[in-house]
C-alpha cells in the first residue's frame, strides 16, 4: 500500500463523513459542480482544463476559499503545534505526578490500573459504572444480536415484536422491580396521547406538562419505598432491584422517547384527520383501518433507490395502526439505545425496523467499530496518566502554575467529552449491527469548537435534532430566536439535572449564543475583506475561553471550584505572560479549525458547526 493511500485512509478515518452516513455532499453542490465542470470544458475545449471547486464562481459567496494547508502561514502554525501541544501534555502530566506536592490529596481516589503498573483515575461515578460493567454489557450485546437474528430468521416474527419482548426483559434485568415505576410513566403517556388525540393542543400541553413533572417527581421520589405507597406492596421492597438501582438516572433519555412517540402519533393522527374530514375517525373501526392501508404503506416501506432520507423518515406516513402499544413499548425499551441513546424518533425507528438502510454495510460498521475501540483506548491512556478528575474533586491544585491549572480544566472537559462519547458510540455500534442507524452524537472533538452555536449543534447531535423537531420549530424557530433559545436551553438544563447551577449554565449559554449571533451579523458584511479571517480568529479565541469557563462551571467544578481555579490562573505573577500565550495559541488553533471546515466545504460538506 502506497504512502498516499495510507494517508488517504488516515484522513478519512478522522473525517466527519466516516462518522455518519447522513453527512454527504448535498444535491445542489453536486449539480453546481457539474455545471461548472461542463462550462469549463466548453470554454477550454478540453476536459483536461484545470478545475477546482475552490475557485468555482457558480458557488458565489458560499464557495470555500483556496486551500491554505501549504502556505507559509500554516507552516508556522504546524511548528507552533509541535511545540505547544507536547508542552500542554507535559503540564497535565506534572499535575498528576507523584512528585507533585498535592499528590497526597487525591491519591486516595486512584485505583490499581492495568497499563504498565500505573494507577487509574476511576473517581468519576458515571464512567466507573460503565467501566466496571463493560464486560457484562459486551455479553448482553452479543446475546441480544444473536437471539434477534435467530428468532427473526426462523420464526419470521416482525422485528418490533422481538424488540418488544427483548425490551421488557432488558428493562427488568436493568431496573428490577423499579421497572414498574418506569412502565407506570409510560402507560400514562400512552393514555394521554390516545385519550386526548382529538384535541391536539390540549393533548400536547398535557403530555409536555406531565413529562416535565416526571423530572421533578423522580428527583423527589426516586427512592420511595413501595411500602409508602401501600402496605400491601411492602414485599416488593425486598425484590430484585436490578444492576442499576438508580432507575431514575437514565429515565431522562426514556422521557425523550416518550415525548417523541406522543408527538409523532398526534401529528400523524391529525394529518389523517385533515385529509379525510368527512370520516368519523376511530382507530378501532375496521373501515378506518382499511381506509388507511394501501398506497401509503407501499410508499414508505420501499427499499433500494427510493429509501427515505433522514428528514423524510421523521415525518414518514406510517399506518395509524402502527402507533400501537406493542410498537410503543418496543421503541421506548429498544435495548441498544435504551440507556443513553443516541436518540432516534419513533417514526425513524419504525421505518428502519422495516427497511435496512444502505449505509449499514459491513465495511461501514467495521470502520465505526475501529473508532469505538480507539476512543476506549484513548480514554484508558488518559485515565492512567492524567488524574485531573481526582484533582478536581479534591481541588488539589495549590501552587500549581497557571498553565497546569488551565490543563486541569481543559483535560477535565476532554474526559467529560470522552465519558459521554464512548457509551454513545458503543450503543450506536450495537444498534448499527442490529439494523438501526441512529445519528452520531459527537460530530466534532470537544477541542475542535470555537462557536457556541456550532458547539451546540455538534455536541449531543441526536438530542439537538430532537430539540429542533419538538421544541425549536414549534416555538417559531429563527423567527422568534430569543424565546426559542430560552425555551430550548431551559428545557435542556432541567433535563440534564434539576439544579440551579445547571439552569444558570443554560441561561449563560443563551446569553453567549445571542452575543455571538449579534457580533457575527455585525461583521458578516466584511467577510470578503482580507483581515476578516484574522478578526474572527481573535473573537473565536475569546469565545473558546468563555465556553470553557461556562462548561467547567456547569458540569465539572461548580461555582466555588471554578472561582478557585480562575483565581489561581489570574492571580499569579506569571498570569499576563500566560494569558498572552493562551490567546496566541487559541488564535492559531482557530485558524486550523476554520481551514478544516473550508476543506469540508470543498467536498460539498457544510455542517454549520
UniProtKB/Swiss-Prot annotation:
What are the catalytic residues? 496
Q: Which family does it belong to?
A: Belongs to the membrane-bound acyltransferase family.
Record keywords, A-Z: Endoplasmic reticulum, Membrane, Signal, Symport, Transmembrane, Transmembrane helix, Transport
According to its UniProt record, where is this protein mainly located? endoplasmic reticulum
Q: Per UniProt, what is the membrane topology?
A: Multi-pass membrane protein
Report the subcellular localization: Endoplasmic reticulum membrane
Induced by what?
Expressed constitutively.
* A GO MF term: O-acyltransferase activity
| InterPro entries (alphabetical) | MB_O-acyltransferase (IPR051085), MBOAT_fam (IPR004299)
Tell me the residue ranges located in the Cytoplasmic compartment per UniProt: 97-133, 191-200, 346-371, 428-474, 524-533, 597-609
Q: What function does the entry list?
A: Probable membrane-bound O-acyltransferase. Together with GUP1, has an influence on the chemical composition of the yeast extracellular matrix (yECM) in yeast multicellular aggregates, such as biofilms and colonies.
What cellular component terms from Gene Ontology apply here? Answer: endoplasmic reticulum; endoplasmic reticulum membrane; membrane
TM spans, by residue? 76-96, 134-154, 170-190, 201-221, 325-345, 372-392, 407-427, 475-495, 503-523, 534-554, 576-596
Query: Would I find Cytoplasm among this entry's keywords?
Result: no
Q: Name one GO biological process term.
A: GPI anchor biosynthetic process
Q: Which residues lie on this side of the membrane: Lumenal?
A: 19-75, 155-169, 222-324, 393-406, 496-502, 555-575
Q: Which gene encodes it?
A: GUP2
Q: What is this protein called?
A: Membrane-bound O-acyltransferase GUP2
**Organism superkingdom:** Eukaryota
Signal sequence, renumbered to the chain: 1-18
Amino acid at each position: 500500500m502506497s504512502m498516499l493511500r495510507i494517508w488517504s485512509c488516515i484522513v478519512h478515518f478522522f473525517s466527519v463523513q466516516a462518522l455518519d452516513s447522513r453527512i454527504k455532499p448535498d444535491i445542489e453542490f453536486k449539480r453546481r459542480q457539474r455545471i461548472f465542470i461542463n462550462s469549463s470544458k466548453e470554454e477550454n475545449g478540453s476536459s483536461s482544463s484545470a478545475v477546482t471547486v475552490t475557485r468555482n464562481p457558480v458557488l458565489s459567496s458560499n464557495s470555500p476559499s483556496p486551500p491554505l494547508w501549504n502556505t507559509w502561514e500554516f507552516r508556522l502554525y504546524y511548528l507552533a503545534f509541535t511545540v505547544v501541544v507536547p508542552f500542554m501534555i507535559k503540564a497535565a502530566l506534572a499535575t498528576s505526578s507523584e512528585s507533585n506536592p498535592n499528590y497526597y490529596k487525591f491519591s486516595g481516589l486512584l485505583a490499581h490500573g492495568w497499563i504498565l503498573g500505573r494507577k487509574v483515575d476511576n473517581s468519576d461515578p458515571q464512567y466507573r459504572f460503565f467501566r466496571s460493567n463493560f464486560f457484562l454489557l459486551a455479553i448482553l450485546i452479543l446475546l441480544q444480536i444473536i437471539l434477534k437474528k435467530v428468532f427473526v430468521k426462523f420464526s419470521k416474527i416482525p422485528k418490533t415484536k422481538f424488540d418488544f419482548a427483548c425490551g421488557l426483559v432488558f428493562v427488568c434485568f436493568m431496573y428490577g422491580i423499579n421497572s414498574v415505576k418506569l412502565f407506570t410513566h409510560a402507560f400514562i403517556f400512552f393514555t394521554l396521547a390516545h385519550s386526548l388525540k382529538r384535541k391536539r393542543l390540549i393533548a400536547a400541553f398535557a403530555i409536555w406538562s406531565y413529562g416535565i413533572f416526571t423530572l421533578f417527581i423522580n428527583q423527589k421520589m426516586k427512592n420511595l419505598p413501595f411500602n409508602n405507597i401501600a402496605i400491601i406492596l411492602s414485599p416488593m421492597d425486598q425484590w430484585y432491584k436490578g444492576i442499576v438501582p438508580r432507575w431514575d438516572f437514565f429515565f431522562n433519555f426514556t422521557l425523550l422517547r416518550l415525548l417523541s412517540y406522543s408527538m409523532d402519533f398526534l401529528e400523524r393522527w391529525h394529518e389523517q384527520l385533515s385529509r379525510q374530514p368527512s370520516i368519523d375517525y376511530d382507530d378501532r373501526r375496521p373501515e378506518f383501518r382499511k381506509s388507511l392501508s394501501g398506497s401509503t404503506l407501499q410508499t414508505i416501506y420501499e427499499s433500494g433507490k427510493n429509501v427515505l432520507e433522514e428528514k423524510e423518515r421523521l415525518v414518514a406516513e406510517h399506518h395509524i395502526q402502527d402507533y400501537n402499544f406493542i410498537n410503543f413499548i418496543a421503541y421506548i425499551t429498544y435495548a441498544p439505545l435504551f440507556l443513553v441513546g443516541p436518540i432516534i424518533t419513533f417514526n425513524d425507528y419504525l421505518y428502519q425496523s422495516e427497511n435496512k438502510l444502505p449505509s449499514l454495510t459491513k465495511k461501514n460498521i467495521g470502520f465505526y467499530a475501529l473508532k469505538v475501540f480507539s476512543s476506549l483506548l484513548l480514554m484508558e491512556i488518559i485515565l492512567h496518566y492524567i488524574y485531573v478528575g481526582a484533582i478536581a474533586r479534591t481541588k488539589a491544585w495549590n501552587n500549581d502554575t497557571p498553565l497546569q491549572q488551565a490543563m486541569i480544566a481543559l483535560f477535565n472537559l476532554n474526559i467529560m467529552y470522552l465519558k459521554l462519547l464512548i457509551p454513545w458510540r458503543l450503543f450506536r455500534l450495537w444498534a448499527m449491527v442490529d439494523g438501526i442507524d441512529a445519528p452520531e452524537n459527537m460530530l466534532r472533538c470537544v477541542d475542535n469548537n470555537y462557536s457556541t452555536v456550532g458547539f451546540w449543534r455538534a455536541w449531543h447531535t441526536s438530542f439537538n435534532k430532537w430539540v429542533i423537531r419538538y421544541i425549536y420549530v414549534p416555538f417559531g424557530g429563527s423567527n422568534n430566536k430569543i424565546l426559542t433559545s430560552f425555551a430550548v436551553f431551559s428545557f435542556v438544563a432541567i433535563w440534564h439535572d434539576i439544579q440551579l447551577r445547571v439552569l444558570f449554565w443554560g441561561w449563560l449559554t443563551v446569553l453567549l449564543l445571542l452575543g455571538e449571533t449579534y457580533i457575527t451579523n455585525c461583521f458578516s458584511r466584511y467577510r470578503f475583506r482580507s483581515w476578516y479571517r484574522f478578526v474572527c480568529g481573535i473573537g473565536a479565541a475569546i469565545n473558546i475561553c468563555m465556553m470553557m469557563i461556562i462548561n467547567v462551571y456547569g458540569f465539572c467544578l461548580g461555582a466555588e471550584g471554578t472561582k478557585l481555579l480562575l483565581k489561581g490562573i489570574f492571580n499569579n505573577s506569571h498570569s499576563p505572560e500566560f494569558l498572552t500565550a493562551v490567546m496566541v495559541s487559541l488564535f492559531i488553533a482557530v485558524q486550523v479549525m476554520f481551514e478544516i471546515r473550508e476543506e469540508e466545504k470543498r467536498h460539498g460538506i457544510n455542517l454549520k458547526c
